[in-house]
Curated annotation (Swiss-Prot):
InterPro entries: TSC22/Bun, TSC22/BUN_CS, TSC22_domain_protein_2. Interacts with NRBP1. Interacts with PKM isoform M2; the interaction results in reduced nuclear levels of PKM isoform M2, leading to repression of cyclin CCND1 transcription and reduced cell growth. Interacts with WDR77. Residues 691-725 form a coiled coil. The lineage of its organism: Eukaryota, Metazoa, Chordata, Craniata, Vertebrata. Residues 269-279, 531-541 have a biased composition (Low complexity). This is TSC22 domain family protein 2. It comes from the Eukaryota. Residues 20-86, 224-292, 334-353, 520-563, 726-769 are annotated as: Disordered.
Length: 769
């Protein structure tokens, strides 16, 4: 851990991230993270969370000094005020509030997610949401700050290894905070968000927030199984989802504002409803949104309401069977509710297929495997949904999104899938169910689920929803959805796909994937997701989630998602996807403003692409829900950092999943490359040393040879000279001389003194030779 801090220290921005976490973990005592962070942490700890958060936010932002961070900074400020005066406007806020209640950290996540959304309003709403979820509002706020920090770090690093390192550092730091804050909830939330954020971070500074939410959800799913132990973790997840919700709302914030306000009353449910409300605006089909809202609200009431009533509805949704039931009712509600009745109905059908997944979900393990089939089945529906449905559904789903009811359509289907991806929770519920599913899963999750979008799937779904929200996009991708279906189940419909993808990977992973699918434009999305929907789902989902929150909040999500997808596809595709997303967003009126944000996100997201590619491998190993969640986060970070982060995760409760994932990351990814490079370097060193040694030996031998040759020539000359000077008698004595060199030499010396000196040495030389 000390190592990690050092690393973090290496990245100044990362340190800032730590501070945010400290604030979050303040409950715990500012664990001494890094000294720099510590000072901040101390301030935060001394101050109330909100205050510390505001203070932290500013300083952190400053430290991180990433343009994105600055934006976040503003957002953070807004967030803090939001905290003071909660703006329930955003469904995200509502979700955040619900999440906060569910989990202290949850709210923070929401805030963070909001920050990721980039929409300052979102941040403000998130802050307010956090406040509404007072119990966890404080913690959640710090997480939000953390997320922004992460984002900032990411942005600062930009693309390239340093960027990765920074992201990693951030992640590790974040995790560290979570650990130190060991607050089960706070810590878990933070950790989850951290994981997500890591991924998001990679994806994009802003993206991180969304991603973190998704990741949390996935984690939640895994935790759901654990429930008792993981409760905190689940809670964190649920919280994250809410934050995601917030993000989603961000886009529609203004739009969904009206919706959001009405929704505020039902915090959790409200959150979902707001989501739907906000989404509807996205869809741009006011009617869609309104009906959606109505439908959503009902659905919300059914399942999302459960969000607020998570416990109660969750009771409903909680039981796997109920989940299924809920999903159906939700789907039904969505169907009737959504303005796009047809699309909703289609989606409804789609969600229903998910319902089975919901059933499966209850058994997360089998649910996942089973999910795929359902997803596949869903996929067809997706195509059935087609874009038209998708579009209509999208708007409806977007509108419904909150509830998941509308979303149920595309999003819902997606959410459902995402929910299903969330194994137990979202799936059964389906979009709305997501909310319900979430309830099913953990109470905390329920809120997220309520967010519906929030659910892991939801986060992803949220992403997907955001896409759905952007009917144009979906429409543009109408072919996309169908095509997606053709692709892996994950790929399938952007939204539906999400669920499918989500379930397949690990729950967490799946959500990611599902998100990815939706976000990814039809072409890229299809190929990317097809090629590596699961892996992509993981990192891309994170990215997408980031984008998704943005997308919903800012429509950035689409771009982000594409990016994440692209990231899987790799940067090459990314640009294209990003462009497509941008175009789509542009086509969509609401999204346009967010588009700029998205554009910013994109670059950030791109760097993560490589990570995403790496992730695919991770995905497989990370099948466990928690693992997938963590894996998402880890993949995002640089390979080098991954290993350390692995150590970190190991230290933490999530450590097992994380560990396996981390190991995986190390094995597949930059880690291997780094090892190879080092081996090569070592070999080169050995070669150079050997070459030097050989050369030296050769030189020495050459010199010796030269000396010997010279001596030989000298002796020959002397011999010739002696022969010429000698007389017959002496020559006749040569044989005797050879026999008796001593005598001969004496004679020679007497005869010719000059040769004498040379000759005696000669003889010894000869003998020696």
């Amino acid at each position: 851990m000390s190592k990690m801090p050092a690393k973090k220290k290496s990245c100044f921005q990362i340190t800032s991230v730590t501070t945010a976490q400290v604030a979050t973990s303040i409950t715990e005592d500012t664990e001494s993270l890094d000294d720099p962070d510590e000072s901040r942490t101390e301030d935060v700890s001394s101050e109330i969370f909100d205050v510390s958060r505001a203070t932290d936010y500013g300083p952190e932002e400053v430290c991180e000094r990433s343009s994105s961070e600055e934006t976040l900074n503003n957002v953070g400020d807004a967030e803090t005020p939001g905290t003071v005066s909660p703006n329930l406007i955003l469904d995200g806020q509502l979700a955040a509030a619900s999440a906060a209640p569910a989990n202290g950290g949850g709210g923070g996540v929401s805030a963070r997610s909001v920050a990721g959304a980039l929409a300052q309003t979102l941040a403000a709403a998130a802050a307010s949401v956090s406040t509404p979820g007072p119990s966890s509002a404080t913690p959640s706020q710090p997480p939000a700050t953390c997320s922004s920090r992460f984002r900032v770090i990411k942005l600062d690093h930009g693309s390239g290894e340093p960027y990765r390192r920074g992201r990693w550092t951030c992640m590790e730091y974040y995790e560290r905070d979570s650990d130190s804050s060991v607050l089960t909830r706070s810590g878990d939330c933070i950790r989850h968000s951290n994981t997500l954020e890591q991924t998001a971070e990679r994806d994009s500074g802003l993206g991180a927030t969304g991603g973190s939410v998704v990741v949390v959800v996935a984690s939640m799913q895994g935790a759901h199984g654990l429930d008792s132990g993981t409760d905190s973790s689940l809670t964190a997840v649920s919280q994250l989802p809410p934050s995601e919700k917030m993000s989603q709302p961000t886009l529609a914030q203004p739009q969904s504002f009206s919706v959001g306000q009405p929704q505020p009353p039902p915090p959790v449910g409200g959150a979902v409803a707001p989501s739907s409300a906000s989404l509807p605006p996205f869809p741009g089909a006011a009617t869609g949104p309104q009906p959606m809202t109505a439908a959503v609200q009902p659905t919300q009431l059914q399942g999302a309401v459960a969000g607020g009533a998570l416990p109660g509805p969750v009771g409903q949704g909680l039981p796997p069977p109920p989940n299924v039931n809920l999903a159906q009712p939700v789907a039904l509600a969505a169907q009737p509710g959504p303005a796009g009745g047809s699309s909703l109905s289609q989606q409804f059908a789609y969600p229903q297929p998910q319902i089975p997944p919901g059933h499966l979900l209850p058994m997360q393990p089998s649910g996942q495997s089973e999910y795929l089939p359902p997803h596949v089945a869903l996929q067809p529906p997706s195509p059935a949904q087609p874009l038209s449905t998708s579009a209509s559904a999208t708007s409806a789903s977007a509108a419904s999104f909150p509830l998941g009811s509308g979303q149920s359509v595309s999003s819902l289907g997606a959410q459902m899938m995402g929910a299903s991806a969330q194994p137990s929770e979202a799936v059964a519920p389906g979009p709305v169910p997501v909310g319900q599913a979430a309830p099913c899963q953990p109470a905390g999750v329920a809120p997220a689920a309520l967010g519906g979008v929030v659910q892991p799937g939801s986060g992803l779904t949220g992403v997907g929803q955001p896409q759905p929200v952007q009917p144009p996009q979906q429409m543009g991708g109408s072919g996309q959805l169908p095509a997606v279906p053709g692709g892996p189940h994950t790929v399938v419909p952007g939204v539906p796909n999400v669920p499918a993808a989500v379930p397949v990977p690990s729950v967490p992973s799946v959500p990611t994937t599902s998100v990815t699918m939706p976000n990814v434009p039809a072409p890229l999305g299809q190929s990317q997701q097809l090629s590596s929907h699961t892996p992509v789902s993981r990192s891309s989902s994170v990215i997408q989630q980031v984008g998704s929150p943005l997308a919903q909040g800012t429509h950035s999500a689409p771009t982000s998602l594409p990016q994440s997808d692209l990231s899987q596809f790799q940067t090459q595709t990314q640009p294209l996807v990003g462009q497509v997303d941008d175009t789509r967003r542009k086509s969509e009126p609401l999204p346009q403003a967010p588009l700029s944000l998205i554009a910013e996100s994109k670059p950030v997201v791109k760097p993560p692409v490589a990570d995403a590619l790496t992730n695919p491998l991770q995905l497989t190993p990370m099948n466990s829900l928690a693992t997938s969640v963590f894996s998402i986060a880890i993949p995002v970070d640089g390979d080098e950092d991954r290993n350390p982060s692995t150590a970190f995760y190991q230290a933490f409760h999530l450590n097992t999943c994380q560990e396996s994932k981390s190991l995986w990351d190390s094995a597949s990814g930059g880690g291997v490359v780094a090892i190879d490079n080092k081996i090569e370097q070592a070999m080169d060193l050995v070669k150079s040393h050997l070459m030097y040694a050989v050369r030296e030996e050769v030189e020495v031998l050459k010199e010796q040879i030269k000396e010997l040759v010279e001596r030989n020539s000298l002796l020959e000359r002397e011999n010739a000279l002696l022969k010429s000077l000698s007389n017959n008698d002496q020559l006749s004595q040569l044989p005797a001389q050879q026999a008796n060199p001593g005598s001969t030499s004496q004679q020679q010396a007497m005869i010719a003194q000059p040769p004498q000196p040379t000759q005696p040495p000669q003889q010894p030389n000869v003998s020696s030779a």
